[in-house]
Amino acid sequence: MKASFWHEKWKKREIGFHESVVNPALTDHWHALSAAGGSVFVPLCGKSLDLGWLLSQGVSVIGVELSEIAVQELFVSLDIEPSVSDVENFKLYSAENIAIWVGDIFNLNKAWLGVITAIYDRAALVALPESMRLEYAGKLIELSNCATQLLVTFEYDQSLHQGPPFSVPESAVQKCYGTRYQLQCLERKAVAGGLKGRIAATESVWKLSRNINS
């Protein structure tokens, strides 16, 4: 899946993936991350309202997003005037306790981010086709040194919808993270009204904790 796919989505305002409320998976299971006073990394963050909620919890937020349109709209929604700078092939939008990198997550440099206490992945893993997931998971592990994750996935009959969001069953989560993390399913429930309003689907919320030996 090319970056141009997501740039086009934002240009055409085809952003049904953007939620108009803070995601309940975050508010209900935030405590599982034990990230109070730390920094939370949000991959493929878009202009999610979840970022403002995280800031309200007193943590620093670090995000990465391909679309500069999304990042500009994020700061408008937060009513924050960011400082904008160029860092190699990224643009960095930053303000007190928040730093959003505009560019390809696969090119992000660990040294730029500092210590990551936890990861919140609501919309990143499910946005990637199977062929990209292992590389993505490896990048998160590299950037965060296996920081604890709160991960949201969907499972449904992939033949009914080409994605994104893609179906990511438990076996796929295990394949991506099972060797480095202990996986705990915190919640599993049917998607109310179905995925895209028509496809029976299950939403799962996972806590990923670093294996002692990883």
Swiss-Prot record:
Enzyme type, top EC level: transferase
Pfam family for this entry, one: TPMT
Residues engaged in binding S-adenosyl-L-methionine: W10, L44, E65, R122
Top-level taxonomic group: Bacteria
Entry's Gene Ontology cellular component terms: cytoplasm
A GO BP entry: response to metal ion
InterPro entries from the UniProt entry: SAM-dependent_MTases_sf, Thiopur_S-MeTfrase_Se/Te_detox, Thiopurine_S-MeTrfase, TPMT
EC number: 2.1.1.67
Location (main, coarse): cytoplasm
Annotated catalysed reactions: S-adenosyl-L-methionine + a thiopurine = S-adenosyl-L-homocysteine + a thiopurine S-methylether
GO molecular function ontology, one term from the record: thiopurine S-methyltransferase activity
Record key words, sorted: Cytoplasm, Methyltransferase, S-adenosyl-L-methionine, Transferase
Keyword Nucleotide-binding: no
Tagged with keyword S-adenosyl-L-methionine: yes
Localization (cell): Cytoplasm
Gene3D superfamilies: Vaccinia Virus protein VP39
Classification via PANTHER family: THIOPURINE S-METHYLTRANSFERASE
HAMAP family named in the record: Thiopur_methtran (MF_00812)
Family, as annotated: Belongs to the class I-like SAM-binding methyltransferase superfamily. TPMT family.
Name of the protein described by the UniProt record: Thiopurine S-methyltransferase
Organism: Teredinibacter turnerae (strain ATCC 39867 / T7901)
